[in-house]
């Protein structure tokens, strides 16, 4: 091969002349651009380039893994996402010379570390020895100085004590020397311990590095030739091997993985925290550092029960009580069962029960008053100071039709009784009358048995009770009830013996009958005034008013006239044009138009006030009855009326009262349900009469509801589905249609929209104006639901004279009818010696071989008894029939 120049060779290799000259220079050959190159020089350059570019053997592996991930989406649907993981790994085979060089470097590093460890040990030993010597010298100096001070102080003492002091000094010196020696020994032990710890630490580090080197040395000859590591770093190799184990773990979780997994039943298995710590140690933390311990928070069960302060309101659920005591709800339920109370976790229990349960479980109970807001509102009132005399509030009570309203009518000189349906009073009327001797406020209560609660309210709101008794009728049931209400309210009674102008009047009989109930006239040594009156003729009215005023003067009735008013609701109703209307009797203070009132569950601002004559008034003082407008709803009769300052607080108190009433009602219902559980399980099918009741005033609704509910029996129950004040609306009709109920209107009518629903649904709508008729018709409806009573009536007796055998019917009794008539296919009884021995049915009845339907008294016949052949001569066959008797509600 001929020689070529550098330029030609550069053109052939497609490189620059300068680069080629530099490559020749690196190979140890000096050339210029115009020099020629021999074949030997070319080979030298090629060998140099090959040696320079040669590297370790490499092997690159690529892997793809595909999986599907379900991602939850909106609407409960899941979405599948395809995931592909790509991994690439390169394994490098090192040159043996390179491995030797690395081993030499590591050996040198180990020797250097060992030398450093030895030097550190020697240095620490020297430092500890020097420190111990210094401390001993300092201790000796301090002791010598202290000894010199003590010797100088002791020179002035008596000579006979010097010997003792010398001995003590020698003993003290010996003790100090012993302490110094002990201190030196402890210092040497401390230094030795530190040296041992340092040596152990260095040895542990050396052992760990040796294990790493061993792992590196053993990896190449023992592993498969394809399992190469990319780097020589120990930590990188650990991370790489860990990733390999994670990838292969899914496939290799077979027998080995199951065998390595600890069994559940193994009592000696390590705890979860130990397993987590070991797992963390195997993985290694960031940078290859091992975690010392698990970061999970540990919790240990308290060694003893924790007693807590449990705050309990008026009502609380079982679950809330359990949370306050930090126990499970099941434990509270168990504690209640031990106390004899059944409960569920969501049941509302009262304060007393919750207190018993909490104290039984060892906790301290703090009872919380939930009516603090109500008390604050009630206390923030300007009630004035000076009390002035006020008019008496007189309630007229007595039996129905004894002339109460007629008596009051004569006093007021108006015709009130004619306006009452049926001539009986059906709600409380409140009136005040001006007389020559002062003003009197009258409350007229119903006398019918249904209005018990009204009479009770009238007695509670009154100062004096006028008991009206008809002279011709005497004491009646409602008269006795009125006496009981008056005694319960502790108010004096003035007896008005009415209808004294009738010929059959007997006032002495009235006195005798009333004396049996503790009402004694003054002439008999009692405290009650008896006045003979006639509401029709007007006799004795002035004497009655004088007796009332005299009794009021004895009572010394006083009230605060100035300030914020308070009173009671006598009656309430819903007016179609004016909304909720309440008749209020003011007890204290003065009620003004525009005042903010709180009335039971309702509140509002007084928009208008009217007296009993329908006249607008701006204010009402004590003992004055007025109608007020502007409440948020119809209050219950008997509720307290209070004037407050803030309408917002009044609303909060009203809403609180509603919620409290609902909670207490639910708790009471739940308790009764659980207590009557077994009784309800045993009772059979009960018919129900559903009623939707609407009336003109609240008192009538209450009285009618009570009367109807009292009609319920074990077989027929009266259920008031809905009740209210005002006309019958479309909502009431819809409710009645849904519950299959009877619509009852008492002094009210249905509006146009309600009538359409009633016609479309064919509902049973009934109007009443007298409570007698309403109760009687509901009784009739309930009677129709009663199952009839079955009664057995004997219609004939036949005496057996002889017995014949029949191939078709068996034994045939030849009988003589002694009483009544014997009918075919009627039930019979066979009596022997007046004892019933068989009860069955008469199957065959013949007379002279002819089948007949009946045989009358005094005739002979043949009787075949169904499924009975033991008929004997002398037996008596009793024929009877079953009749149904319709029962009625008493």
UniProtKB/Swiss-Prot annotation:
What ranges does the record list as Basic and acidic residues composition bias? 92-217, 267-280
Q: At the top level of its lineage, which domain of life is listed?
A: Bacteria
Q: Where is the tr-type G domain?
A: 389-558
Per the record, where are the segments of Polar residues compositional bias?
Answer: 67-81
Q: Where, by residue number, does GTP bind?
A: 398-405, 444-448, 498-501
- Output the Pfam families linked to this UniProt entry: EF-G_D2 (PF22042), GTP_EFTU (PF00009), GTP_EFTU_D2 (PF03144), IF-2 (PF11987), IF2_assoc (PF08364), IF2_N (PF04760)
InterPro entries documented for this protein: DNA-bd_dom_put_sf (IPR009061), EF-G-like_DII (IPR053905), EFTu-like_2 (IPR004161), IF2_assoc_dom_bac (IPR013575), IF2_II (IPR044145), IF2_N (IPR006847), P-loop_NTPase (IPR027417), Small_GTP-bd (IPR005225)
Renumbered residue ranges of the record's region G5: 534-536
Acetylation as UniProt keyword: yes
**Annotated segments matching region G3:** 444-447
Q: Where is this region: G4?
A: 498-501
Per the entry, what this protein does is: One of the essential components for the initiation of protein synthesis. Protects formylmethionyl-tRNA from spontaneous hydrolysis and promotes its binding to the 30S ribosomal subunits. Also involved in the hydrolysis of GTP during the formation of the 70S ribosomal complex.
Give the family, as the similarity comment puts it.
Belongs to the TRAFAC class translation factor GTPase superfamily. Classic translation factor GTPase family. IF-2 subfamily.
Name of the protein in question: Translation initiation factor IF-2
Q: Which gene is this protein's source? A: infB
């Amino acid at each position: 091969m001929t020689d070529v120049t550098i330029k030609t060779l550069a053109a052939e290799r497609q490189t620059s002349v300068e680069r080629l000259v530099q490559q020749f220079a690196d190979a140890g050959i000096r050339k210029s651009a115009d020099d020629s190159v021999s074949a030997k020089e070319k080979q030298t350059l090629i060998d140099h380039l090959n040696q320079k570019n040669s590297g370790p053997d490499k092997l690159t592996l690529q892997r793809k893994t595909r999986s599907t991930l379900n991602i939850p989406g909106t609407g409960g649907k899941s979405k599948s996402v395809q995931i592909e993981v790509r991994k690439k790994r390169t394994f490098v085979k090192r040159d043996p010379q390179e491995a030797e060089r690395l081993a030499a470097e590591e050996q040198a590093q180990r020797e250097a570390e060992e030398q450093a460890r030895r030097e550190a040990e020697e240095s620490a030993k020297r430092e500890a020895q020097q420190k111990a010597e210094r401390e001993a010298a300092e201790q000796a100096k301090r002791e010598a100085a202290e000894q010199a001070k003590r010797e100088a102080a002791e020179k002035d003492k008596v000579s006979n004590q010097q010997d003792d002091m010398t001995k003590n000094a020698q003993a003290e010196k010996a003790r100090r020397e012993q302490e110094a020696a002990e201190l030196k020994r402890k210092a040497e032990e401390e230094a030795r311990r530190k040296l041992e710890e340092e040596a152990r630490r260095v040895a542990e580090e050396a052992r760990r590095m040796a294990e790493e080197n061993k792992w590196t040395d053993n990896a190449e000859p023992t592993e498969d030739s394809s399992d190469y590591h990319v780097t020589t770093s120990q930590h990188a190799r650990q991370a790489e091997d860990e990733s390999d184990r994670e990838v292969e773990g899914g496939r290799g979780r077979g027998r080995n993985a199951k065998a390595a997994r600890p069994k559940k039943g193994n009592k000696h298995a390590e705890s979860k925290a130990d397993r987590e710590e070991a797992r963390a140690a195997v993985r290694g933390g960031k940078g290859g550092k091992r975690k010392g311990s698990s970061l999970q928070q540990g919790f240990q069960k308290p060694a003893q029960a924790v007693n807590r302060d449990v705050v309990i309101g008026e009502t609380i659920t079982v679950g809330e009580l359990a949370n306050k005591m930090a126990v499970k709800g099941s434990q509270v339920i168990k504690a209640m069962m031990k106390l004899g109370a059944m409960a569920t976790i969501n049941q509302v229990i009262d304060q007393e029960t919750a207190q018993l349960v909490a104290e039984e479980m060892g906790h301290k109970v703090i009872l919380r008053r939930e009516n603090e807001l109500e008390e604050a509102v009630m206390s923030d009132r300007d009630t004035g100071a000076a009390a002035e005399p006020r008019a008496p509030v007189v309630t007229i009570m007595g039996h129905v039709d004894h002339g109460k309203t007629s008596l009051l009518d004569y006093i007021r000189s108006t015709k009130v009784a004619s306006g009452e349906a049926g001539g009986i009073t059906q709600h409380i009327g409140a009136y005040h009358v001006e007389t020559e001797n002062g003003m009197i406020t009258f409350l007229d209560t119903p006398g019918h048995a249904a209005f018990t609660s009204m009479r009770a309210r009238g007695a509670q709101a009154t100062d004096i009770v006028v008991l009206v008794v008809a002279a011709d009728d005497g004491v009646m049931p409602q008269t006795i009830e009125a006496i009981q209400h008056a005694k319960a309210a502790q108010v004096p009674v003035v007896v008005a013996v009415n209808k004294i102008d009738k010929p059959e009047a007997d006032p002495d009989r009235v006195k005798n009958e009333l004396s049996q109930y503790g009402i004694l006239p003054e002439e008999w040594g009692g405290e009650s005034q008896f006045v003979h009156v006639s509401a029709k003729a007007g006799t004795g009215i002035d004497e009655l008013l004088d007796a009332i005023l005299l009794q009021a003067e004895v009572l010394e009735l006083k009230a605060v006239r100035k300030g914020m008013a308070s009173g009671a609701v006598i009656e309430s109703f819903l007016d179609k044009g004016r909304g909720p209307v309440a008749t209020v009797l003011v007890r204290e203070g003065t009620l003004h138009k525009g005042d903010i009132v709180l009335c039971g569950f309702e509140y509002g601002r007084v928009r208008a006030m009217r007296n009993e004559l329908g006249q607008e008034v701006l204010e009402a003082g004590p003992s004055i009855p007025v109608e007020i407008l502007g409440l948020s709803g119809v209050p219950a009769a008997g509720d307290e009326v209070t004037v407050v300052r803030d309408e917002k607080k009044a609303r909060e108190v009203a809403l609180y009262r509603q919620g409290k009433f609902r909670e207490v009602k639910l708790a009471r219902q739940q308790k009764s349900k659980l207590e009557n559980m077994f009784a309800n399980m045993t009772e059979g099918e009960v018919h129900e009469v559903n009623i939707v009741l609407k009336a003109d005033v609240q008192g009538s609704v209450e009285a009618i509801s009570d009367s109807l509910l009292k009609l319920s029996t074990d077989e027929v129950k009266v259920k008031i589905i809905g009740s209210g004040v005002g006309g019958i609306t479309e909502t009431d009709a819809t409710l009645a249609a849904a519950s299959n109920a009877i619509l009852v209107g008492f002094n009210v009518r249905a509006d146009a929209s309600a009538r359409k629903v009633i016609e479309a649904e064919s509902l049973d709508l009934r109007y009443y104006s007298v409570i007698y008729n309403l109760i009687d018709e509901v009784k009739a409806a309930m009677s129709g639901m009663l199952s009839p009573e079955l009664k057995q009536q004997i219609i004939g007796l036949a005496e057996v004279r002889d017995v014949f055998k029949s191939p078709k019917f068996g034994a045939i009794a030849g009988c003589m009818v002694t009483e009544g008539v014997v009918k075919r296919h009627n039930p019979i009884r066979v009596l022997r010696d007046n004892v019933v021995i068989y009860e069955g049915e008469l199957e065959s009845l013949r007379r002279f071989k002819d089948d007949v339907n009946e045989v009358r008294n005094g005739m002979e016949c043949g009787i075949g008894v169904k499924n009975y052949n033991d008929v004997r001569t002398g037996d008596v066959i009793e024929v009877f029939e079953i009749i149904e008797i319709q029962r009625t509600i008493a």
